[in-house]
């Protein structure tokens, strides 16, 4: 079979020797076809060139030796040689001294070196017949010439043997007449190199036809003898050339350079044997036939034949007649071969190490599994998973709903029948992982101790009495009933007042597990209710994740920023929360992933929001709202001293250093730098102050300077936090006619709001009103109502005053970049119009708020606490509130109401008496 692999379609001449293991295999296969017999090494004498039937001795790849006859008369060998070298086997044989004309045999890939046996395949019948005739006449000698390459090296062509040989064959056939045709006037020998090798045909073996046209082929064994030069063409069919036999240039065998180069070639060949042991047989044969390595010309040819260089480099060695130059060229090729061999060995070793390491680990793991399985210590993955799920589920079976028990049992049965490699196996495994991990009926211990809860809440937060009272009420009910139920508490207030942090304190006070997630910007319903299991990477919703994370069915869950829910093409999360936050429905909450009811009725939900306007009505209806107002200055001072200052010093590394802020500086820091309703900005400023103190302390330590305690006073604030961004809320110390102080509140807290009114032009029919200041539709309507009401009210108070009928008025609300809207400015705008019309200023240090109807009724408004705090911060002494807000004002603590006079009115006539009917 290996011999048949040597036969190629459309090949005229092919060298079968190659520098690789595969090429040696082909050579051995060919020799087997020729009838080479293996004999014992001890039973074979050394080859000698003087005998007619001298034997050529060579060592085969399997360790045996074969004999090849190379007599003077050209008799064929009874056994051929196998080669493990690049170009064949080096031999010593007798040969005639002169042949001026020889039959030319083209070699497509590698030149034949003297002393080397090379198998060659020919397919031309005429050439085969001529060679057989020459052998019968005892003149079986030819000239072997390497074909000239066209555009690419033979080494690259060897990678595409079929295409490259086809091209060479076409040129050879056209030149030497293997197909009976030739180019007019062209010398076919021009396609071959001028320097070749005088070779003896050792044997010719006919091979069976392997081409579509039934052509036969033959394989030659060529033994190279010496170099020759092609002088010209004598005959074209077949190609016979005139040659000149060449001899090596004379050299001094005792020359130091030649000796050194020879020794280096020998050493390099030994190095090559370490990386490529396939050359070892050739070297052993060479040592046996040439006594030692002190024959430089033969050593150079041997070394070149062992190299896998391209045809141009090997042809250069063949053409060198200078022994010194030939040794140098061979040494260069051998050095390259050694480096390539080392690189191949390194790559092979790395690959073998990796493969052997992986295989060893695999075998050990398999053995370990087998041992454990025999001992009953381990089962396969599927069995282990089923046991794990069963072990996890059995203790909870009695507390799990019957419907869920049925689903889990079915899924376990389904898992046992699935192959671990199937995709459904992973889906079922993940589903069971979630089902068996949930805390079915497992409730955490909670502390229903009012005193403990009060202590924890007061330790973490200052104020927030409404929230604290609600939690204490929740605990009290739980004490009396002996059990607690889930509730939905929503805390609404400006940023920085402690809504989120109070949720953690509630969990600590109750002794429950705490879980927080934010729904701000959430637009995917799957975040709440989970994904369908059919989707890749499906997961349950946040609430199911919460139960698995906490491991109990009664945690405190903080849903942050519920007023900022989004809405997109994935659905409406606000609508999904309806089921979650409904105490009547969340006992059987259905997650899309689990698809079994889950009891959330024992969960205490705490939601946070800045405003209620953006929360859908049906969702808001399910919540218990607790409002958190902003802090006044005194409260902020207490919070700063009790909580923020200590934390800021600790973060700055000043826990052991004496650095304090005076009370005056703290009040100024709050009043001029941190006027927001919460204390988050105050916390940032305190951290900034103590960071600068830390810088001073660090610099003092670096210079071994003792730093005195640092006291930060009012005058030092500029150095620590810069210039104050706020000066005062009051634009006017004394309001002129037409200017009134109003009160407003937003999600950021309360603030004072000035209403300014002035006349533009007067005359008959000019009684119009213009409004500016980015007023919303509701506020514009309030202005129109106020203008209409003021006309009638002015006539009742001052019948002869026709100012409003004849004057165009302009109402403006300062801070024009800030949008403003709401109905609570009605009484303020009316008072501003009356003040201008009557040319009478409003009572000093007075502010008001309230919605005015067209008939003069004053309706209640919201944000009483925030507005009261804003009025006090601005230095207001008297506040006019609607009568309907008296209950809200009475609920305020004494420290907020201290120093304020509140006037409650139900009609505008009462507003007029408090604001305009006063003596200057």
From Swiss-Prot:
GO terms under cellular component: mitochondrial matrix
Keyword Magnesium attributed: no
Transit peptide: 1-58
Protein's UniProt keywords contain Lipid metabolism: no
PROSITE patterns reported in the protein's UniProt record: LON_N (PS51787), LON_PROTEOLYTIC (PS51786), LON_SER (PS01046)
InterPro entries, per the entry: AAA+_ATPase, ATPase_AAA_core, Lon_bac/euk-typ, Lon_lid, Lon_proteolytic, Lon_Prtase, Lon_prtase_N, Lon_prtase_N_sf
A single BP term in Gene Ontology: mitochondrion organization
Chain intervals for the UniProt region annotation (Disordered): 65-94
Active-site residues (renumbered): 824, 867
Subcellular location: Mitochondrion matrix
Single GO MF annotation: sequence-specific DNA binding
Residue spans of biased composition, Low complexity class: 75-88
Assigned EC number: 3.4.21.53
Keywords, sorted A to Z: ATP-binding, DNA-binding, Hydrolase, Mitochondrion, Nucleotide-binding, Protease, Serine protease, Transit peptide
Domain Lon proteolytic, chain residue ranges per copy: 734-918
Reaction it catalyzes: Hydrolysis of proteins in presence of ATP
Domain Lon N-terminal positions: 102-338
Family statement drawn from the similarity comment of this UniProt entry: Belongs to the peptidase S16 family.
Assembly behavior: Homohexamer or homoheptamer. Organized in a ring with a central cavity.
Function: ATP-dependent serine protease that mediates the selective degradation of misfolded, unassembled or oxidatively damaged polypeptides as well as certain short-lived regulatory proteins in the mitochondrial matrix. May also have a chaperone function in the assembly of inner membrane protein complexes. Participates in the regulation of mitochondrial gene expression and in the maintenance of the integrity of the mitochondrial genome. Binds to mitochondrial DNA in a site-specific manner.
Entries under HAMAP family matching the protein: lonm_euk
Protein name listed in UniProt: Lon protease homolog, mitochondrial
Taxonomic lineage: Eukaryota, Viridiplantae, Chlorophyta, Mamiellophyceae, Mamiellales
């Amino acid at each position: 079979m290996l011999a048949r692999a040597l036969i190629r379609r459309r090949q005229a001449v092919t060298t079968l020797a190659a520098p690789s293991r595969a090429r040696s295999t082909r050579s051995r296969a060919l020799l087997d076809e020729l009838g080479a017999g293996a004999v014992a090494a001890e039973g074979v004498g050394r080859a000698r060139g003087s005998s007619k039937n001298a034997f050529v001795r060579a060592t085969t790849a399997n360790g045996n030796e074969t004999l090849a006859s190379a007599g003077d008369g050209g008799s064929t060998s009874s056994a051929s040689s196998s080669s493990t070298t690049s170009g064949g086997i080096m031999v010593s044989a007798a040969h005639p001294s002169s042949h001026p004309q020889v039959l030319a045999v083209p070699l497509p890939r590698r030149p034949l070196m003297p002393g080397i046996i090379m198998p060659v395949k020919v397919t031309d019948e005429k050439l085969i017949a001529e060679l057989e005739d020459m052998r019968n006449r005892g003149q079986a000698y030819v000239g072997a010439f390497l074909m000239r390459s066209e555009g690419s090296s033979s080494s690259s062509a060897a990678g595409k043997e079929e295409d490259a040989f086809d091209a060479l064959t076409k040129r050879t056939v056209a030149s030497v007449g293997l197909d009976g045709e030739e180019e007019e006037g062209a010398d076919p020998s021009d396609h071959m190199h001028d320097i070749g090798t005088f070779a003896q045909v050792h044997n010719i073996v006919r091979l069976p036809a392997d081409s579509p046209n039934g052509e036969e082929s033959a394989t030659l064994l060529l033994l190279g003898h010496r170099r020759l030069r092609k002088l010209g063409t004598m005959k074209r069919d077949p190609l016979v050339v005139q040659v000149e036999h060449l001899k090596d240039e004379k050299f001094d065998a005792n020359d130091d350079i030649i000796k050194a180069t020879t020794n280096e070639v020998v050493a390099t060949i030994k190095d090559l044997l370490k990386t490529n042991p396939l050359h070892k047989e050739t070297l052993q044969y060479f040592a046996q036939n040439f006594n030692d390595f002190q024959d430089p010309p033969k050593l150079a040819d041997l070394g070149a034949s062992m190299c896998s260089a391209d045809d141009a480099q090997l042809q250069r060695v063949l053409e060198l007649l200078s022994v010194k130059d030939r040794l140098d060229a061979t040494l260069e090729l051998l050095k390259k071969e050694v480096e390539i061999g080392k690189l191949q060995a390194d790559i092979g070793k790395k690959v073998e190490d990796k493969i052997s390491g992986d295989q060893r680990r695999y075998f050990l793991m398999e053995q370990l599994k087998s041992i454990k399985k025999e001992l009953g210590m381990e089962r396969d993955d599927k069995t282990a998973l089923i046991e794990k799920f069963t072990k996890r589920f059995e203790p909870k079976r009695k507390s799990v709903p019957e419907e869920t028990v049925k689903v889990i049992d079915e899924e376990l049965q389904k898992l046992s029948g699935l192959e671990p490699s199937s995709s459904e196996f992973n889906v079922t495994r993940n589903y069971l992982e979630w089902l068996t991990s949930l805390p079915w009926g497992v409730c955490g211990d909670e502390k229903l101790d009012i005193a403990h809860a009060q202590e924890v809440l007061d330790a973490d937060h200052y104020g927030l009495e409404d929230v604290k009272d609600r939690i204490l009420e929740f605990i009290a009910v739980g004490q009396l009933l002996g059990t607690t139920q889930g509730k939905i508490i929503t805390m609404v207030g400006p940023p920085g007042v402690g809504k989120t942090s109070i949720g953690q304190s509630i969990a600590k006070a109750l002794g429950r597990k705490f879980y927080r997630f934010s729904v701000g910007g959430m637009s995917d319903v799957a975040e709440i209710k989970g994904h369908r299991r059919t989707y890749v990477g499906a997961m349950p919703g946040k609430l199911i994740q919460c139960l698995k994370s906490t491991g109990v069915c009664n945690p405190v869950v903080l849903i942050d920023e519920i007023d900022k829910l989004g809405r997109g093409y994935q659905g409406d999360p606000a609508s999904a929360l309806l089921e979650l936050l409904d105490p009547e429905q969340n006992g059987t909450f259905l997650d899309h992933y689990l698809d079994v009811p889950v009891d959330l009725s024992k969960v205490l939900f705490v939601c946070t929001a800045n405003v209620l306007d953006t929360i859908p009505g049906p969702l808001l209806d399910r919540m218990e709202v607790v409002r958190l107002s902003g802090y006044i200055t005194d409260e902020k001072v207490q919070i700063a001293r009790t909580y923020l200052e200590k934390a800021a010093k600790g973060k700055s590394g000043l826990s052991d250093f004496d650095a304090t802020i005076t009370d005056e500086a703290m009040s100024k820091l709050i009043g001029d730098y941190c006027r927001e309703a919460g204390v988050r900005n105050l916390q940032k400023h305190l951290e900034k102050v103590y960071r600068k103190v830390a810088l001073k302390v660090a610099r003092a330590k670096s210079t071994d300077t003792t730093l005195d305690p640092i006291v930060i006073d009012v005058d030092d604030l500029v150095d620590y936090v810069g210039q104050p961004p706020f000066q005062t809320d009051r634009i006017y110390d004394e309001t002129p006619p037409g200017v009134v102080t109003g009160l407003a509140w937003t999600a950021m807290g309360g603030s004072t709001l000035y209403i300014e009114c002035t006349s533009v032009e007067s005359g008959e029919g000019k009684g119009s009103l213009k409004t500016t200041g980015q007023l919303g539709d509701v506020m514009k309507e309030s202005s129109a109502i106020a203008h209409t009401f003021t006309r009638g009210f002015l006539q009742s108070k001052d019948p002869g005053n026709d100012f409003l009928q004849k004057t165009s008025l302009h109402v403006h609300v300062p801070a024009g970049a800030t949008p403003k809207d709401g109905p609570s400015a009605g009484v303020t705008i009316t008072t501003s119009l009356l003040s201008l019309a009557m040319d009478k200023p409003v009572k000093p240090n007075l502010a008001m708020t309230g919605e005015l109807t067209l008939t003069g009724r004053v309706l209640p408004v919201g944000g009483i606490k925030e507005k009261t705090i804003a009025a006090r911060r601005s230095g207001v002494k008297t506040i006019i509130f609607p009568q309907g807000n008296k209950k809200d004002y009475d609920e305020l603590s004494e420290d907020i109401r201290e120093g304020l006079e509140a006037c409650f009115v139900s009609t505008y006539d009462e507003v007029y008496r408090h604001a305009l009917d006063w003596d200057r």
